[in-house]
Amino acid sequence: MRAIWLLAVLWLAGCQHVAVAPPPAGEILDLRNGQVLTAQQLLMRLAEPERVIVGEQHDNADHHSVQLWLLQALDEQRPQGSLLLEMLTPEQQSKVDQVRRAATPPADLPEALAWQDGWDWNLYGPIVRFALTQPYPLLAANLDTAEIHTFYRNPPVLKGERSNAAPVKSTLLEQISDSHCGLLTESQMPAMLAVQQQRDRRMAERLLAAPTPSLLLAGAWHARKDVGVPVHVLDLGAPEAPTVLMLAEQGSEMTAAMADYVWFTAVTPKQDYCEQMRKQFGK
């Protein structure tokens, strides 16, 4: 009983003021003019727009440390309106809301949220735990599994001039092929592209509907200004695209067409995802 009481105290304590730790290390650039920024200068710039997207490398722990710092530090600049996660689906939203309303935290938070195994809880857990103690909503931004299967089998017509531009589609097709290690057949590519763009469209819709100032955390390709969610935000009629901060490892190619700002972090050891994928494909 005492353990449960202590958990409740800690849970409620999260609703109070959080002392923001120093920012994680890294080199920050304004890609529009090449200016080197301090973390505080970046913070001031990100506090102004209504909508911000932060692109990540999913398995990079430094990126999630930066995201948590940004979430906490931005709230010091102005009240946060909402946080959206690519890692949450619509079918999880009611579970998220239920946990937020609870007087005490669940004994097993990932289980209570039906957290998907594909997203490493050790990396995302601190962000989710913090967000659940705050007054603003934590919102799902992705598609449900059933929707993905539907879009794969019957790709819908995507409306919008920018998202249908040939350079956008060709760039995404190349990325899809590379990320699947060249194991996809040509016949699979249109359906895979449709799913990717429907994910981007959903995130754009959710971002536009969310209370502002809003922050979306998503994979780098979803975040990109030239091919990802920002393109769909404009196709949906928004007067301006969201501001994009890309988190990237040192040495990564990053241009002003891709993002407004970049926060370079240390290079991490690469996992051989292609080897894992070849085993799944039996090749």
What are these regions (language model features)?
Residues 15-283:
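Compositional signal for N-terminal targeting/processing segments
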